[in-house]
Amino acid sequence: LALHNPALQEVLNDASRAERNLTINSIDAARPLILAGLATTTPLLVVTATGHEGEELTAELATYLGDGVAYFPSWETLPHERLSPSIDTVGRRLEVLHRLQLADHPNKNCPITPLRVVVAAARSLIQPLQGSLAHTEPFILHVDQEIDFAELPTILTGLSYERVDLVARRGDFAVRGGIVDIFPATAEHPVRIEFWGDEISDIRTFAVADQRTIPDADLTWVAMYPCSELLMTEDMEHRAAKLSQDLSLIHI
């Protein structure tokens, strides 16, 4: 109902007629509502001063837009530090980039919601990105899907997931008989995928603490985003081989 407020509609009409920049002065509490209204007619990139402000604004916008808004986090580390960014951060960044692609190129076969609004702190936007990351897609599994069970560990390893005996953190996966436990990079809980031969019969979430499935938390599909922004793709292997060959020709 708030989005149909006459005063808000007047602001939105002015915004739609603006040819260049438009400055809107409002109280802080009204900003999420105004942004949600603007998002009904055009995709938005909302820039905040800090990550904390960005996370808070994303939560407020979600009350109006649901899954149509996401926060684009920045790395917790500098590009040349030995420390790697957390798997959660990497997964969320790749998820946002993928969902932006879905907004431009809808895919009826993809169950993931496209984005209307991306919220990002200024720091997130000044960190350089590989151009190929915009085309990174998740590995999606769904109930009744048939997939070569023997190839699944290889696929997950290629997405920088680590095979372990017991899943405990994001990026882990374990194989026991016809069951595969995976902790997706962007998920709150890990998932347990049961196979009947090469067919997926069940997908359930489970708790890390006791490894038991969570009641009434069955899923019809699950998406695994990569755990690293640097993946050994075929193109990357060719470039590495070419670089190695070039370096072998250099004599010091």
Predicted regions mapped to residue ranges:
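ASCE RecA-like P-loop NTPase motor cores
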Residues: 1-250
